[in-house]
C-alpha cells in the first residue's frame, strides 16, 4: 500500500509544499442568476438572485505564455435548502428538500486567473446527446438511498427530472472533452467542450457493479497520466476505517476498487470524512481534500 500523508487544515495552511514559495487566494467573480418568478423574498435571497457557484470541483488546464492560469470549474445541482418533513399518502413523514431553482441546468465554467483576479467565463450548460438539457432535480424522490420530497419555495411538491444529474467531480480529457462524476447515477459522463454528452459509464458497464446498490456515494474525479479516471465512494463496504477508491480505464471499461485508509486520530470518534475533491499530481499520486468533524471539535 502506498504511503499516505495526512495534514490537518491548520498545518496545511501554514506549510508550503516543497518548491512552492507562496500561495495566493482569489475570490472568483461569477454571474448572478435569477430565481423563478414569484419566489423572491421567500428565500434567504430576498432580491431573487443567487451566485452561480463554480467550486463544486476544479481542474487545472494550462498556463498561457502571458502567465494567465486556466482552470475549469463545475457547478453542483443548483441551490437547495433543508425543508420541513412532509406526509406522504399513507400519512408517514418523510424528509424534504427545497430546490430554489428547479430548472437549474448544471454547467462547466472556464476560470481565468490573471492580473490578480479570477474570473469565470463562458459557462457551458450540460445536455444529453440529443441536446436536451440536464437538470439538477433527482430522477425520483430519493437522495442516495433515503426517500425525500422535492419542494419548491412555494411548498409545492415537484416531480423528478427525466434527465437528472448531480455533478460532484470534473476531469479534463485531452481529447477535447470533460468527464463528470454524477452522484445520482451513480455514473461517469463524458461531455464535449460544448457540453453535449458523448458517453456514460454505469455500474456493470464501466463502473464496478456493486455501485448499483450505493446511489449517491461518488465524490470527486481525477485523471491520471495513464488515462485512468479516479473517483471516491464515500462508503467502503461496511468498513468504518476506509473509503473506497474506484479507478476506471474509459477505453477498455476495466475498473479496479481500492481501499483508502481514514486516519482515526484526526476525526471525531464515530465519524468519517467526506471527500471534498482530489487532484492527480503525477507519479500515481493524488492530492485529496478530506472534510469532516475534527477530533477535538465540540
Language model features with spans:
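Sequence/structural signature of beta-propeller domains
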Residues: 1-298
Amino acid at each position: 500500500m502506498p504511503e499516505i500523508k495526512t495534514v490537518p487544515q491548520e498545518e496545511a495552511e501554514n506549510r508550503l509544499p516543497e518548491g512552492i514559495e507562496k500561495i495566493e487566494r482569489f475570490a472568483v467573480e461569477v454571474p448572478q442568476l435569477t430565481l423563478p418568478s414569484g419566489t423572491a423574498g421567500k428565500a434567504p435571497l430576498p432580491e431573487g438572485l443567487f451566485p452561480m457557484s463554480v467550486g463544486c470541483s476544479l481542474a487545472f488546464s494550462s498556463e498561457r505564455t502571458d502567465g494567465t492560469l486556466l482552470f475549469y470549474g463545475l457547478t453542483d445541482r443548483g441551490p437547495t435548502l433543508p425543508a420541513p418533513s412532509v406526509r406522504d399518502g399513507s400519512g408517514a413523514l418523510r424528509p424534504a428538500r427545497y430546490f430554489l431553482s428547479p430548472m437549474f441546468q448544471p454547467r462547466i465554467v472556464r476560470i481565468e486567473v490573471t492580473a490578480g483576479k479570477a474570473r469565470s467565463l463562458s459557462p457551458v450548460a450540460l445536455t444529453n446527446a440529443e441536446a436536451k438539457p440536464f437538470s439538477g432535480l433527482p430522477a425520483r424522490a430519493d437522495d442516495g438511498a433515503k426517500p425525500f420530497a422535492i419542494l419548491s419555495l412555494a411548498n409545492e411538491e415537484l416531480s423528478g427530472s427525466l434527465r437528472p444529474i448531480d455533478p460532484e467531480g470534473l476531469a479534463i480529457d485531452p481529447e477535447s472533452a470533460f468527464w463528470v462524476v454524477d452522484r445520482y447515477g451513480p455514473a461517469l459522463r463524458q461531455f464535449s467542450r460544448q457540453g453535449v454528452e458523448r458517453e456514460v459509464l454505469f455500474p456493470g458497464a464501466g463502473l464496478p457493479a456493486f455501485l448499483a446498490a450505493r446511489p449517491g456515494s461518488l465524490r470527486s474525479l481525477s485523471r491520471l497520466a495513464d488515462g485512468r479516471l479516479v473517483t471516491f465512494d464515500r462508503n467502503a463496504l461496511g468498513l468504518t476505517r476506509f473509503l473506497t477508491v474506484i479507478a476506471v480505464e474509459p477505453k477498455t471499461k476495466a475498473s479496479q476498487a481500492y481501499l483508502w485508509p481514514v486516519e482515526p486520530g484526526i476525526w471525531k470518534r464515530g465519524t468519517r470524512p467526506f471527500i471534498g475533491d482530489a487532484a492527480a499530481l503525477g507519479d500515481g499520486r493524488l492530492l485529496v481534500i478530506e472534510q469532516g468533524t475534527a477530533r477535538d471539535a465540540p
